[in-house]
Amino acid sequence: MNLLSQFMKPKNKFSIENLRYLHNTLKKNQIITAQNKNLIVESLRQIAEVMIWGDQHDNLFFDFFLEKNIMGFFIQFLAQKTSTEVTIQLLQTLSILVENLRNENSIYFLLSNNYINEIIIHKFDFSSEEVLDYFVSLLKALSLKLDKSTVNFFFNHVEKDFPLYTEAIKFVNHKETMIRIAIRTLTLNIFKVENKEMREYIINSTAVPYFSNIVWFIRRNCMSLSKVLEKSNHDSSYQLKDYMDELTDQFYYLHDIFNLGFESMNIVLAEQFIQYLIYPVFIGSLIDPLKNPDLEDRITPTLALYLLAHVFNIFSFKPLLDTISSALLTATQSQAQLFTSATTAPPPLSTIASNRRHYNSFRRFSSFPNLESLEAMKNDGITSISDTDGRIGASGRLLNNTSTDEDSPPNSGFKPSNSVQSTSSSPSTPKKYQQQFSRLFGSSRKPLPTTPSSSPKPSTTSSITTSTTTTTPTTTITTTTTTTTTTITPSSSPSKQNLSSSIESTNSLNNNNNNNNNNTTANNDNLESTQPKEDNLPTITVLNLNSPNENSTKDDNNNNNNNNNNNNNNNNNNNNNTTPTPSTPTRKRFKFNRNEFKESLLHLIGSDRETFGIVIMLYSFLKNQHIDKRILEKGGMLPYRLALLEGLLSPETNNNNSNNNHHHHHHHHHHHSKTTVTSPNNQQQQQQVSHSTGGIKGQKNSKMSASLPINIGHNRSRSESHAKSLLFNPNLYDTVTLEERSLFKTPSPGSSSLFGELEIETNKTDEGGDEKDEYDDGDDESSVNIRIKSSKHNSINSSVDSTIDLSKNNNNNNNNNNNNENNNNDNNNENNNVNNNNNINNNNNEESEEEEFVPVPESSQKDFTRRLINALFMVLVNSNQFRLVTLQMTLLILKELVYSSDSSSKLTETQALLLEQAYITVTDNLKECLSGPLSEVFLEIFEEELRSYKQIIFESLMEDVSLILPIPQKPVSRLSLSHRLPSGELERTQKAVQQFLVLRELKFTLLRKKDTMLPLKQPPTPMVKEKYLFNLETGVVESSYDIIEYHHFEKVSGPTPPPPSGTPRKRFTHYGVLFHNLLLAVDPPPSISSSSSSSASTSGSGTPNSSIGGTGGGGGGGMGSGTGGTSSPNPSNIIGGTNNKGIYGTIVHIAPLQRLEIETSHRDPSILRVTSHPTTWNVEMVFDDSTQCSKAKQMLERVRDDVRATKMRQIYALLGEKDPDDDSVPPQLNYGNMVERNPTNSDHDSNTTLNNEHNLLSSNNNGEFSTSMSNTPPSRVITPIDTSNSHPLANILGSDDNISFVNNNNNNSNNNNTKKTTSTVNTPISTPHKLKKGNRGSSSNSSLNDSILPTLEDHLRKTVSPKVDMFNTSFFDDTLDLKELISTDELNNGNNNNNNEDNNENPFSNIKRNSNEVKVGQPVQQEIEKEKEKENIIGEDVEKETSIEQKEIKKDENDNNNIVEKEEEEIKDDNIKEEIKQDDSNNKEINNDNSTTNNKEDEEEEIKKDNKDEENIVNIEHINEKEVQEQQTEEQVEEIIKESVDIKVESDNN
């Protein structure tokens, strides 16, 4: 059976027998031929399936797999190289096994021998893409199984062989994207494994060639991206985006490597990244091509800035960022040489093999201190990085080339790796390596322990020469590139000190010695090209870790500084003797300027494209939290980090200490300045100096940063005296340069602070010294005053000078100043000046106490910072030339530079003027748009832009590479407005609004003010939602909202056939309620809707029944009609009883009044179309006649215009302008009294519960619902409330309230009318409307009949003096209080015209004055009697006047009714004419054969038409006659009023 089983395929696929069968198949077919090729492929595929099943179920499978050595057959098949199919299947089988094995023992079984390594190093034919894909997939699968134990299966620590890694990295730059991604994943998995021997192998053997090739590949991609950028446009930017995505992926891959914590490898990677990419490409491309002609790979400045922004945005490795930041802000000569030096491609990775011997040929670039030198420095007790041949490292530090390899040239940048592999390079060495690197780059300020020693030992690995003196040894460190000599003389008594303190003191010493050497070698022509002008954090520092007592060191140093100046030439000779010079000197390309990068930035600010690159680079640079803040301070990018500056810049401190500072500075500037170092003998003197130069109040020994200026205070310097002249100076950025003074910090022993006691360097600061050499042409004169290099100063515009003089405003008394808004209000209310001045002054006092902006002196900002901020403000001044995205990023970068959350913004006077000028510019632009062709829709544009305005998201901005493309001249559909310039009036208006919002935000932020005018204020409105119930019947309570009753035709939906001709369409009654600033579409109860649908006449007489469940009514509005209106109301749902006052309609839509579109239908003038924007709700309001339609249109348009005018007044006030449509100051709307009710008749107070806070429903039957109602009352009902003070029509409509009584209460007596009207005399009159139930016909049912009567308004305006407040009184009131009118008139005259008693416009002006005169000497009783007589006379006159007026009003009403009827007839005639024209056109097209009959009909119609025209002419004549009669009646009324007034005046005089 066993014999047969070997030849027969088992039925069970997952069994040992099947695995044995597959093994026998491979054994029989060990030589691949064309016949057995497919059989071998199938067998290999089945082996993978069986082994995976066995891994999860039975361990015997792997025992058999190892026993039969099946992996050996795999090696045999690979060695034949005859079939690609077998090779692919073999690699796939291995990948499946490695990926799916879960048992740890199975993985060990598979990897325990060297078969996997032999397969890895096999020479595959990678010309086949499938072979390469499966090979890389196998390598990636193996890397996923790596850990501390499994790595030993791949890495041979004896032979230093790691084939999995060395073979994989050859494909890191492959053209296939998926292969590159797989190799990145593999290398990251390998770097994660914490195996010391493996990491040592990687750092010593493959790190330099691997990382150099990666960075070179990124460099090639940058060049390709630059070429694509030049050819691309916004319509074809997809290829550009693909290149940028690939480049970003590469950056994130390097970022992931940095985050692994492989410290020594991170240093090598940073070194290659800087050497091949950052310095020569990114920074070198920003330097002027004339100064850098040898740069081969140059990209556009915009792309270089954009890529630098990505570097600062992605990377977080502190040493890397500190090195780049130092090179950008304070570049040394060595760094500048790397900016302009040409680099060659590194050796390819294809030369790397699995044999260890091949790795020795690679030489790593030794710009960083290598492991051997660190170990030597540890043994010698001296930490020193110096260069014996003057070569420069990639990071700008001096290189340590101690190689003894004779094959290496003197200036070679590579070092043989055999020195790195010495026994001193232990796995623990990289930590020391990183500590040394971090210390030199300023990444750590923690003190490190030092080893005490009596004297340093000489070392052969460093260029340190030791000389002895009689007392103490002196260690002299020489550097040929800087031509300076720094001598440190340690004391014999050892002591420990903080490393950070050593760095600070050494930096100060090096800076002072450099200054001294500059003075002694001023005649040297090559000085500026060889001498660094500023102490730089990454610059080489010479430290003695066995530091003895610091005090004696500093004393000796002070004594040796003078000898250093006199013996400088001798020291240089010694340097030449002890240090070999380079064999090939570097050719001088241009005059070295350490601020070359900063000058390039300032030069590029001007065009939109380059400015955008600068602002995103600076923002990414400043927002990176991993950059050492000291570098930013020294470079002028972070001048206000310490809160201590607030106390130093206070005017009080400056006034007390300015004279002392001046005297002290001249005392220390007699000769070449130098830093005085703290010692026990001069501690007291130092404290006095520190105290005299300023500090925090109440503290004698203030400790300050070196970045603080020495001119502390508010005295105006010479640069500030002409600050205004710089505003419109075309050479704004080059006219002023400052030589700043700063206070240097010197560490003191035992001090726990980061900074030592205060010391003064009176000649130069970190940047000031350089600026002196650069701008002042070597002038060495010492002066406290700030010097200016400017030969011409343009005068500032006088208008701006008078408008924006911030310095004067700071010293003026706030009690005498009023802001522009208050002044405008005072001009409109001249009579209230005395009363308002105190309030305005008090408000100004409160604002000034909260925050007062005080410009900082020019000296508080470094030259580069000041010029950069001024340039960015000039971008805002010329904001029309820049895109919105550039302006928004400029806003963010200015906030980073000058804004402080703890104190006022650090703006100089010039910068404050530029800010104000920019704000005035954008405000003027917006004013032009406000009066432009889009003025009618300006409010909508402004609100939409304000709604969409938001802060920019920097991360999303960095992902949009199209922003660095040339700005398109034509609009691009896929490009938003913020990313391009506007095209057309609409886009220009939108951009003007956005510009205004950006500048307003910046201004109020920097000045620390709260914007109280944005967003625009909305009038408070009670919350209303759809499906709420609205009380349409208010009973006897006089409400102040308007109701428009209209009809809506039933919509035919579905396959229902249209009704036969002549059949009237069903229509339903609906209501439009003008509720505050909203139009509510309300469905009435089914009873009203059904009754109105039966006919166009009125619903039944009496009080209609209303259903609480009104939601079943018609559809209402434009929502369609409901089915409830067509059926008879259900008696069970009807509220019975005669006392039922509530009629509840359902709100079906809420439309803002501001954006209503109102138009009359062209088909029927009695139909009004109302559309609500931005929603799609629309409705066709059908009225009984065209007159009602026109009145409804007039009302809606007037209300809409009032709502819009309210917001437009806010916009005008925002721009500092007066509304041109507002001739007088309107009464302010009182939005606070939202729940007040109009006074009502006392007879109905017991039947209403509107004042109850807990009952929002209008009650019936004394506050209770009838038993016929539903068990559950409505959950939410909107009860009409008094909105007379907030309704837009409150100030327009005068006496419609009384008209409603005239029209709808004919059956009532006049006494009842007078009782009702007297209760509303003193309240603003609106247009309350109830549901009309009269029997005057369908036209009288509509509330529109009582809405607006233009003729009556004109009549009232003519008959009554303008000084009488028509909105607070009513001439239809039978009990009009004339005395109240007279007193109100006189009061208004006193307030508005400065109590001018000679004003004759008001006929009642003399009445009150004469009536109040009291003759001296008359008894009081007689006066009282006369007053009573006067009152009686006045009362009689008033009654006569009111009766006359009522008669005239009735006549006017009749005339108006006649006019309305005539207008209806005219409209009908017009409709008939239009129908005739339409019929004519239709008849001509349809019936051409029946021309004779048509002509007859036309003749008849023409005859009818002529007849109607004649009738119309007669009607017009009647109308003219009536108009003449009306004018006569008006004149009569005026004469009567005048006569009555004269009578009253005479009676008063008598």
UniProtKB/Swiss-Prot annotation:
Region: Disordered, residue numbers: 382-588, 653-723, 744-859, 1086-1137, 1236-1283, 1301-1347, 1386-1513
Q: Where is the composition biased (Polar residues)?
A: 538-551, 689-705, 1263-1274
A Pfam family name for this chain?
Answer: CLEC16A_C
UniProt biased composition (Low complexity):
415-436, 451-529, 558-585, 785-799, 809-845, 1088-1108, 1247-1262, 1302-1323, 1336-1347, 1388-1397
- Every FPL domain range: 44-191
Query: Acidic residues bias located where?
Result: 768-782
- Basic residues bias: where? 661-674
Composition-biased stretches (Basic and acidic residues): 1423-1433, 1440-1454, 1469-1487, 1502-1511
Q: What does the entry give for GO biological process?
A: autophagy; endosomal transport; regulation of autophagosome maturation; vacuolar transport
Keywords attached to this entry: Autophagy
Identify the InterPro entries for this entry: ARM-type_fold, CLEC16A/TT9, CLEC16A/TT9_C, CLEC16A/TT9_N
The UniProt entry's sequence similarity note says:
Belongs to the CLEC16A/gop-1 family.
Q: Give the function comment from the record.
A: Regulator of mitophagy.
Protein's UniProt name: Protein CLEC16A homolog
Organism of origin: Dictyostelium discoideum
| Lineage of the species this protein comes from | Eukaryota, Amoebozoa, Evosea, Eumycetozoa, Dictyostelia
